Every structure is written in structure tokens, then in C-alpha cells.
Amino acid sequence: MNRRNFLKSGSLAGLSVTAASLVGCKTETPKETKTSEDQEDRFELLEWTIPQLQEAMASGKYTAAAITQLYIDRIHAIDKDGPLLNSVLEINPDALAIAKGLDKEREDGKLRGPLHGIPILIKDNIDTADKMQTTAGALALEGNIASKDAFIVQQLRAAGAIILGKTNLSEWANFRSNRSCSGWSSRGGQTRSPYLLTHNPCGSSSGSGTAAAANLAAITIGTETDGSITCPSSVAALVGLKPTVGLLSRSGIIPISHTQDTAGPMGRTVTDVAITLSALTATDQQDPASVAAKGKAAKDYTQFLDAKSLAGKRIGIEKKPQGTNHYILALLDKCKALLTAQGATIVEIEYLDKIDELGRHEYNVLK
């Protein structure tokens, strides 16, 4: 079953019900309340994976410039207009020129790797030394142009990726108030869920999550200190990976915690995430955590993709899940059965009773 059919089968409805409404967040409901689902038949790259895009470029069906333009048009159609997803803060004005340069390299027989010519959106707390701002969504940093690319941006450019634009986020990556709203920033306003426009997109990588789910780019990059990749990925039915701290450089990323911060890919398939992770990993001498992890990273994470990889794995699930929605609980039971059928062992654990205490310990670390 592909991802789009999986969403239509009902699992998305479960994800949507779990997303809390935007209580306390000032946001206007757009006049056009159609979701990105309503424009499926209009977008020819819907749910295309990175390997599919590469195959299309290799065959000559599409160029990187054509693909980039299609994603830009998609952003204008449903992010800046229509349902007004509001997930992209700005589009790189040089994206098409970069794409054309990469097309020329392809014509000349120079391919940089699996990300050659692939448009990527990145979170607005990651430095780019180009014509785009880096503000963490804050008006306080409006007009800030980085003098140097973040290390992971250097890696993406070297791999042939096209930095298509910057995504909205919970301002300052949600580290500004214990009453802040997921997906809202003073610079960008409120990011919306592509599936339920009035529901919480989660955060702080809200724009990256919405943009990936709505097919506004091939893949996106988020950052996480505490749930900022995994939470928006979960409510948008994405594959979101928070790597072990140190696997990816944090240089050039607006910091919160030196013990918990990391960037990570957010995509529609495990393969796309593995391809992107492979390009991001390298030792950065300016990041002590990266130096400490030297020699521990793989060069190609796609080698670990195995449909039988769940066999023998132990997966912990909360014994007493939050909420009493019978539909959600039924979906959870189906998930357990599916994991068990794939050879995994479900281990019921109890941590919710201790979550407040654990939260206090974590907050002390963050301080």
C-alpha cells in the first residue's frame, strides 16, 4: 500500500482526531477551506519519491528546473493561496538558476549523487548564505542574512540539492513561552495542518511537516530539541527522524540546548529520509558533538533498508494511552497487530505517571 492510499484508508482520520485544536492561537480560517487533498489531480508530482524524480530526470521526462518550477507553482497554489497552508516563509529567488546549473552538470555527465537536482525546503532557524533570511520566525531577526551556510546546508548543496526555500516554525523553535502555539511565528503567522486546516500541525518544525505532507518539496529539513521533528511528522503521517545528537552538525543552527539539539529529515517515505540522511552526515570540526561522533556515521543509510527489519525488535508502547477515543484505540490495536505480524515484540511500558517528573528533569537540562 502506498502512502496516499494508506492515508485514505482511514489511518489519517485517526491521526487527525489526535491533533488538538488551535486553542488560544489567533488565526483566521481561510475563505477557501479546501485542503491540499482537493488539488491531487492537478499536481503531477504528487507523492513522487526522490528515486522517482531521479528516474524522470535521467530519462529526460523532466529537468531539475521543471521540477523546481512545479514545486514553486504548488507553493503559490495551496500555501500562499487556496487553503493558505502558510508553511513556507520565503522561496529562494535563485532556486531556478541553481536548478538550471545542475541540469547543465547532468548534461555534461556530472552527477553529484541521489540528491542531484532535488528541491528541498529547510526550517528558518538554519543559516543559508544566500538571498533568504534566517530568523527563527521572529520579527526581532527580520532582515538577518547569514554570512555562511550552516554545515548541513553546505552538505546539501555539495550533494546537488536545491534549497527551495525556508519553512515557517513555532517562533524560536517554541522556546519562548510555555503557552506558545505550535506553528505560529510573528514573521510568518500560523502554519496549518494540510489535512485539517483548523487543527494543530504540532511543532516546532510545523512548516517542514506541513510542506512535506502537502508535496511542496521532495523532502524537508526540521530541527528538534524535544519532539519538534517527531511530533509534526506524526500528525502529518510523515517519516520524521531525529538523529542521535552529534550525527549531524549543529553549526549554523540557532541553538536551544547543546545536549539535545539536532537537525533531521522529514519525508514521505523511509527511503527518501535515508537518502537525505546520507547526504547530511559528515564530521564538522566546529561542532564538538560532531567531532565526538566521528567514525560512527554511515555513508549510505539506504543499505540498511530491509522490509524484514522488524523481526526480533522490541517496541515499547504505553500501557495506558492518553485519551479515550474508541476509534483511535482501535487503530492503535491494529498497529500493534501489524507490528507483531512483522516479527516485532510489543512491550507495554508505563511512563505517563512519571511524565511530569521527567519533564522537570529535562527542563533543568534545558536551562
PLM feature spans:
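Peri-catalytic substrate-binding/gating loops that frame the active-site cleft of hydrolases
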Residues: 54, 135-148, 154-157, 175-193, ...
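Acyltransferase
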Residues: 68-69, 100, 150, 300, ...
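Twin-arginine (Tat) signal peptide motif
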Residues: 1-7
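Active-site-proximal beta-strand/loop segments in catalytic clefts of secreted hydrolases
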Residues: 124-125, 165-169, 221-225, 318-320, ...
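Short, well-ordered alpha-helical
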Residues: 9-10, 14-19, 26-142, 172-174, ...
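Short glycine/serine-rich loop segments
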Residues: 148-280
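Flexible, acidic loop-helix segments that line cofactor/substrate-binding pockets
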Residues: 90, 288-294, 313-314, 349-364
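A short helix-breaking turn/cap at a secondary-structure junction
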Residues: 26-36, 242-330
